[in-house]
């Protein structure tokens, strides 16, 4: 079974993936901007406000790449390490004395609504999201 993930935004993307041989698709960012998503209103609004040029590839503390919205947290990382005050022991290979930031703290900040001091992971098409919708409406849009 082949599942296509990443870059799926609308029905045309789903059709294209299936035409290329995918058995299904995985969609993430579109569902963040739904009423049912438990992210804070500020987190969802960051998605709505995002432009394509706000997306930056960053490295996790253990070197894995990911797309994130450029904010005060990311700008600070560009210039310096963000000291870690508490280790959550979430990653075996993480050394709090050496890594540039604590990913757990950054994610907690963002989910709680501190979008300036948090890490807001997103998909490549986040700049195309322009409203908060419902899961029902989104599923209808993707399937009809």
Question: Which positions does each model-derived feature cover?
Answer:
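Conserved active-site-proximal phosphate/metal-binding subdomains
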Residues: 9-144
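Short hydrophobic "strand-cap" motifs at the C-terminus of beta-strands
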Residues: 5
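Conserved small/polar residues in nucleotide/adenosyl-binding loops
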Residues: 1-2
């Amino acid at each position: 079974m082949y599942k296509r993930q990443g870059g799926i935004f609308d029905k045309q993307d789903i059709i294209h993936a299936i035409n290329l041989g995918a058995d299904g698709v995985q969609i993430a960012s579109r569902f963040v901007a739904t009423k049912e998503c438990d992210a804070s209103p500020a987190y969802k609004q960051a998605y709505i406000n995002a432009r394509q040029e706000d997306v930056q590839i960053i490295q996790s503390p253990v070197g894995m790449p990911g797309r994130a919205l450029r904010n005060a947290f990311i700008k600070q990382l560009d210039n310096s390490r963000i000291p870690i005050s508490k280790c959550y022991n979430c990653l075996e290979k993480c050394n709090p004395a050496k890594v540039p930031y604590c990913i757990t703290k950054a994610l907690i900040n963002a989910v709680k609504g501190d979008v300036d001091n948090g890490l807001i992971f997103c998909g490549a098409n986040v700049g195309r999201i322009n409203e908060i919708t419902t899961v029902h409406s989104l599923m209808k849009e993707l399937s009809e």
